Swiss-Prot record:
Entry's Gene Ontology molecular function annotations: anthranilate phosphoribosyltransferase activity; magnesium ion binding
Chemical reaction(s) catalysed: N-(5-phospho-beta-D-ribosyl)anthranilate + diphosphate = 5-phospho-alpha-D-ribose 1-diphosphate + anthranilate
Pfam families in the cross-refs: Glycos_trans_3N (PF02885), Glycos_transf_3 (PF00591)
Gene: trpD
Organism: Pseudomonas syringae pv. tomato (strain ATCC BAA-871 / DC3000)
Protein's UniProt name: Anthranilate phosphoribosyltransferase
Lineage of source species: Bacteria, Pseudomonadati, Pseudomonadota, Gammaproteobacteria, Pseudomonadales
């Protein structure tokens, strides 16, 4: 199916099959469509609402065209990532959590990008911390193998996305592509925590990942609107495990953490986010740093559970608490910066 045929279907509120969506996405991602066609298709899909079949088709093409990171094993390798777009401008919780996960002895293949609507994306934060971003897939694999954590800069691995950049920017609205980033990890991880901007997406995206071969995934959205586990409100979870998706709510107290407000956790820049994270990961914390640490532990614990490094969410949170308070997570952040600096010298020589 070509994009003109797809547009005719979509404007009449008719769904595409997985194979039809693959055909259209391949046209879009290989530069065969005009920007007007891409913009019209994205808006038509949003107004119709994307189906699980359509998202599966779109994700499979993005994965197919990605510059992949080949790891020795995917067993227990985890990613923690969010769609963004929650409007809260909270510090980079998932990125900070990644270093706690690594400090707990679990391998992390982190996928992320610069901020689109927020103040600080994962790439912005890591760059502020001195981490070199423009790594080759082989260099990322070496980071993961040697440091226990590596960062895959989305724009370096999904070059075909350049064809959608103009229409997405000009539309200025959430589209199908806001959902695709967290589902297209270039290392092909099968264990994830995925935060989403709308609770209604939790189960559908868990179903998408089930069909695409994921093993253990938590897709989450908090009652106070965050695309991650919240310290201040219950969080809704769609959990994919053992080939089935179950749904439930989790309170911080269920996991041994006291609920408290998010006051003080919003940031205005990557530098401010980094300052708060270094405070939270350090041995001596300010009051706000302690609160940030609790938020990090909550989310890192969920990822340790998704990685099957823990047998329950509560056990994962306990392991994350211990790992954060050793100070090793902060050392991991510095270690990744030093390790990638060597690649920067190689690449820019």
């Amino acid at each position: 199916m070509n994009i003109k045929s797809a547009l005719n279907r979509v404007v009449n509120q008719l769904d595409l099959s997985t194979d039809e969506m693959r055909d259209v996405m391949r046209e879009i991602m290989t530069g065969q469509c005009t920007e007007a066609q891409i913009g019209a298709f994205l808006m038509g899909m949003r107004m119709k609402s994307e189906t699980i079949d359509e998202i599966v088709g779109a994700v499979s093409v993005m994965r197919e065209l990605a510059d992949k990171v080949e790891l020795k094993t995917l067993d227990g390798v985890v990613d923690i990532v969010g769609t963004g777009g929650d409007g809260a401008n909270i510090f980079n919780v998932s990125t900070a959590s990644a270093f706690v996960i690594s400090a707990a002895g679990c391998t992390v293949a982190k996928h992320g990008n610069r901020a689109v609507s927020g103040k600080s994306g994962s790439a912005d934060l890591l760059e502020a911390a001195g981490v070199y971003l423009n790594l080759t897939p082989v260099q990322v694999a070496r980071c993961i193998d040697s440091v226990g954590i590596g960062f895959m800069f989305a724009q370096s691995h999904h070059s075909a996305m350049k064809h959608t950049a103009g229409p997405r920017r000009e539309l200025g609205l959430r589209t199908l592509f806001n959902m695709l980033g967290p589902l297209t990890n270039p290392a092909g991880v099968r264990h994830q925590v995925v935060g989403v901007f709308n609770q209604a997406l939790c189960r559908p995206l868990a179903e998408v990942l089930l069909r695409l071969g994921s093993k253990h995934v938590l897709v989450v959205h908090s009652q106070d609107g965050l695309d991650e586990f919240s310290l201040a409100a219950p969080t809704f979870v769609a959990e994919l495990k053992n080939g089935e998706v179950t749904e439930y709510w989790v309170q911080p107290e269920d996991l041994g953490i006291k609920s408290q407000s998010l006051y003080g956790l919003a940031v205005e820049s990557p530098a401010q986010s980094l300052e708060l994270i270094r405070d939270a990961l350090g041995r001596r914390k300010t009051e706000i740093g302690q609160k940030a640490a609790e938020m990090i532990v909550l989310n890192a614990g969920a990822a340790l559970y998704a990685a099957d490094h823990a047998t329950s969410l509560k056990e994962g949170v306990a392991l994350a608490h211990d790992a954060l308070h050793t100070g090793l997570a902060r050392e991991k952040l510095d270690e990744l910066g030093a390790f990638t600096a060597v690649f920067k010298q190689e690449n820019e020589a």
